[in-house]
Regions:
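Structural signal for well-ordered, non-membrane alpha-helices
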Residues: 47, 51-58, 84-88, 115-126, ...
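Short coil/turn linker and secondary-structure boundary residues
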Residues: 57, 71, 102-105, 128
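Short acidic/polar alpha-helix capping motifs at helix-coil junctions
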Residues: 24-28, 135-137
């Protein structure tokens, strides 16, 4: 009985933690179509897809590789984390060092870090205007050589790449027999939770 109680408490705590992470659902639409609001909504869509694609992955899901020469789902999550870090750093015009200096070492830390990076980006982007967007740069430093790119490249680069790789996670987990939760509706940005 005591073991059952402990299991229930741990399960409840894990679910509470997951529900406290950003992008459990997409917020209501904004009243005006502005560049900032569109970017904000795009990141919400990316975050929502990632939230549900990466939720409740098991060891066999994380270890899965479609072929021996492919990277695993876990390695894909690491790559997605780096993409999210670059997205967040762009809002601050902060340098992205390559190779990446520090990546979270556990599945839960990767997942939370990725979602929090996207949330930080959205928190910052809401304070921007059209002129601010023109000043946002994606800055890379590789071995002391710095290169910067305009905000446009973030849209077809890291953001699009994150959507692509999130789709891989969805596909890989379906292959391992652990599909995403039923009720996830990426069109509405809401999830119908089953009881």
């Amino acid at each position: 009985m005591r073991l059952l109680q402990l299991f229930l408490i741990l399960s409840f705590n894990m679910n509470a933690q997951n529900n406290n992470l950003p992008f459990f659902e997409i917020s209501s639409e904004k009243n005006h179509y502005t560049s900032v609001n569109i970017i904000y909504r795009l990141i919400e869509g990316v975050g929502y897809r990632y939230y549900w694609a990466s939720k409740d992955l098991k060891k066999e899901d994380l270890d899965y590789k479609p072929s021996s020469s492919s990277i695993s789902s876990y390695e894909t999550l690491e790559h997605i984390y780096v993409l999210s870090e670059t997205i967040m750093n762009s809002a601050l015009n902060k340098v992205n060092n390559r190779p990446t200096e520090k990546t979270p070492k556990s599945y839960n830390e990767l997942r939370e870090g990725t979602l929090m990076n996207l949330q930080k980006f959205n928190d910052i982007i809401l304070s921007k205007n059209e002129d601010d967007l023109k000043r946002i740069k994606i800055i890379f430093n590789r071995g002391g050589r710095e290169a910067s790119f305009p905000f446009w490249n973030l849209l077809n680069g890291q953001i699009a790449d994150m959507i692509y790789h999130t789709g891989q996670i969805v596909s890989f987990r379906r292959t391992t027999g652990n599909p995403i939760q039923k009720g996830v509706n990426v069109f509405l940005g809401k999830t119908k939770l089953s009881n």
